[in-house]
Amino acid sequence: MAEFGISPGQLVAVFCDKSSSEEALKKLVGRVQGLTGSEGQVFVENITQLLQSAHKESSFDVILSGIVPGSTSLHSPEALADMARILRPGGCLFLKEPVETTGVNNDKIKTASKLCSALTLSGLVEIKELQREALSPEEAQSMQEHLGYHSDSLLSVHVTGKKPNFEVGSSSQLKLLHKKSSSVKPVVDPATAKLWTLSANDMEDDSMDLIDSDELLDPEDLKKPDPASLKAPSCGEGKKRKACKNCTCGLAEELEKEQSKAQSSQPKSACGNCYLGDAFRCANCPYLGMPAFKPGEQVLLSSSNLQDA
């Protein structure tokens, strides 16, 4: 038992299965209790009840699974993950499991490399294969009875793994090295500094001609232009004047003023019912005799209608 590294006062879990003999289990537990002492504790449980037990996280210092002589326990990924969960940070797991030594693709029995990969995926580190040994006649018979599997290429492998010194999801502060700013200024090449430096004395050199921006404009350029002169030659030609799209010459504003002036000269209804028809119009309504129209629709009256009104 010295290879398991069990110390006095530690909490140890021993997992077995139905293939483990009671005498061998009692003998193993007695030896472990002798190592843990009165301050420690040894917990024994069937591996098939591990997931249902719902142990608290970080409960055990050492876990022994399948170590009972004659045991042929097979560890599922879920069982390995739960063992890693209930191990304390820095705790160790020791297990023994039958493995295939050939490259036969088998869903029941893993190879030694797949067993180590499963331990790594469960969250353990420092996975090591301690030893391999042939199955005893009792173990071979147990494989045949409980698992219905028989093969001449089976071996029993002992593997160990360690839980990292931190819990999953824990956080710690990183000590970042901040680079101190140097008080010594970098050396600058004088030739390079002179190349990229423009002196004020160079600006006052008589050989440099500066352009006066005021001399670029003539007196005619400073006069405000007449809006009529900005119109295009073909803008508004024809019987019906029409402003161009995005007009900038002022024709659009001019047409808008003329339209608003024409609308203001039209007579306005005092009752507001003129558009409904003659049945709703007054006796002196200028729209008498005209059909009904939509509210807001522009209706032009002839001079005779205006005179009658």
Swiss-Prot record:
- For the motif Cx2C motif 1, what are the positions? 271-274
Where is [2Fe-2S] cluster bound in this sequence? C235, C244, C247, C249
The intrachain disulfides are none
Swiss-Prot/TrEMBL keywords: 2Fe-2S, 4Fe-4S, Apoptosis, Cytoplasm, Iron, Iron-sulfur, Metal-binding, Mitochondrion, Nucleus, Phosphoprotein
* Location of the region described as N-terminal SAM-like domain in the Swiss-Prot/TrEMBL record: 6-172
**Where does it mainly reside?**
cytoplasm
Return the annotated region ranges for Fe-S binding site B. 271-285
Residues forming the motif Cx2C motif 2 are: 282-285
Q: Write out the GO cellular component annotations.
A: cytoplasm; mitochondrial intermembrane space; nucleolus
Matching entries from InterPro entries are given as: Anamorsin (IPR007785), Anamorsin_N_metazoan (IPR049011), CIAPIN1 (IPR046408), SAM-dependent_MTases_sf (IPR029063)
Which parts of this chain are annotated as the region Linker? Answer: 173-222
Task: Report residues binding [4Fe-4S] cluster.
Answer: C271, C274, C282, C285
For the modification Phosphoserine, the affected residues are S182, S183, S213, S269, S302, S304
- Requisite cofactors: [2Fe-2S] cluster; [4Fe-4S] cluster
> Which Gene Ontology MF annotations are present?
2 iron, 2 sulfur cluster binding; 4 iron, 4 sulfur cluster binding; electron transfer activity; iron ion binding
Gene Ontology terms: biological process: apoptotic process; hemopoiesis; iron-sulfur cluster assembly; negative regulation of apoptotic process
Q: Which CDD domains match?
A: AdoMet_MTases (cd02440)
Q: Where does this one sit in the cell?
A: Cytoplasm; Nucleus; Mitochondrion intermembrane space
Family according to the record: Belongs to the anamorsin family.
The written remark on domains in the entry is:
The twin Cx2C motifs are involved in the recognition by the mitochondrial CHCHD4/MIA40-GFER/ERV1 disulfide relay system. The formation of 2 disulfide bonds in the Cx2C motifs through dithiol/disulfide exchange reactions effectively traps the protein in the mitochondrial intermembrane space.
Quaternary structure, from the entry: Monomer. Interacts with NDOR1. Interacts with CHCHD4.
> Which named protein is this?
Anamorsin
The protein's organism comes out as Rattus norvegicus (Rat)
